[in-house]
């Protein structure tokens, strides 16, 4: 495997340190039922009283070939017919429920939703998914545009893959609420390129991350990035057999390791 040049490494590092907010909520959709504030990061649904269902869309589509992660803080107590997070296409209907109370995201084939009541919805079909969420919870959403999977997190704990076969579909982040004076804050909206390097992150154990961070300071931008946790597969690392650390002189970097470390390390013969 060819080594990674310093210019390529710098580009990847800049990629990982891109803006904490690559997108915000679309102010063009602001109506009397939706109030945006704090540079369009905060949303207040139905500021006075509610007469139906309101929805907000991200101001940018989610680019293909990337891992996308965004996180929404539930500021207020949640109640009522439904409060949902999810994604939708440009054809997703955003205004047809302004005078009726409903679970809007996932009512048709153009959107996919996760309800605060703990169920998923798409194409009008619902199924039980995970725990409920409410005030002070952080709801995370991870879209892998390469594999076409969408999964949700609550307080950084993964709930498992929710939807599949989302490849080659241009999607936008969506949130909806029927609740009066419901406040949400977009705390993260970031992405990284899908690559062998990011794939390596999915199988690194905590002690391996700590070791690489110590031995290869240039990798800290990668290992200490939020995606190092988001992409982590569910593997039992409590078993001591998995935590054996070999002396450095016996370590040989194979192509898998070399892809992660990049330039500057050569294999021992």
List each model region and its residues:
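PRY/SPRY (B30.2) beta-sandwich protein-interaction domains
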Residues: 1-269
């Amino acid at each position: 495997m060819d080594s990674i040049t310093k210019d390529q490494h710098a580009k990847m590092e800049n990629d990982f340190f891109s803006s904490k907010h690559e997108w915000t909520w679309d102010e063009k959709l602001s109506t009397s039922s939706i109030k945006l504030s704090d540079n369009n990061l905060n949303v207040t649904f139905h500021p006075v009283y509610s007469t139906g269902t309101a929805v907000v869309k991200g101001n940018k589509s989610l680019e293909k070939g990337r891992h996308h992660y965004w996180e929404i803080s539930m500021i207020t107590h949640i109640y009522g017919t439904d409060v949902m997070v999810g994604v939708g296409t440009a054809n997703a209907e955003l205004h047809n429920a302004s005078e009726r109370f409903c679970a809007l995201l996932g009512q048709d084939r153009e959107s996919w939703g996760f309800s605060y009541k703990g169920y998923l919805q798409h194409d009008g079909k619902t199924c039980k998914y995970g725990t409920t969420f409410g005030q002070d919870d952080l709801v995370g959403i991870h879209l892998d545009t390469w594999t076409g999977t969408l999964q949700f997190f609550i307080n950084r704990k993964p709930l498992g893959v929710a939807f599949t076969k989302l490849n080659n579909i241009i999607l936008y982040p969506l949130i909806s609420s029927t609740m009066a004076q419901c406040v949400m804050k977009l705390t993260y909206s970031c992405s990284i390129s899908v690559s062998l390097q990011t794939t390596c992150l999915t199988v690194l154990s905590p002690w391996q991350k700590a070791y690489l961070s110590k031995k290869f300071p240039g990798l800290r931008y990668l290992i200490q990035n939020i995606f190092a946790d988001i992409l982590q597969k569910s593997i039992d690392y409590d078993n001591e057999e998995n935590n054996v650390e070999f002396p450095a002189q016996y370590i040989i970097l194979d192509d898998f390791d070399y892809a992660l470390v990049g330039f500057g390390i050569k294999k021992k013969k």
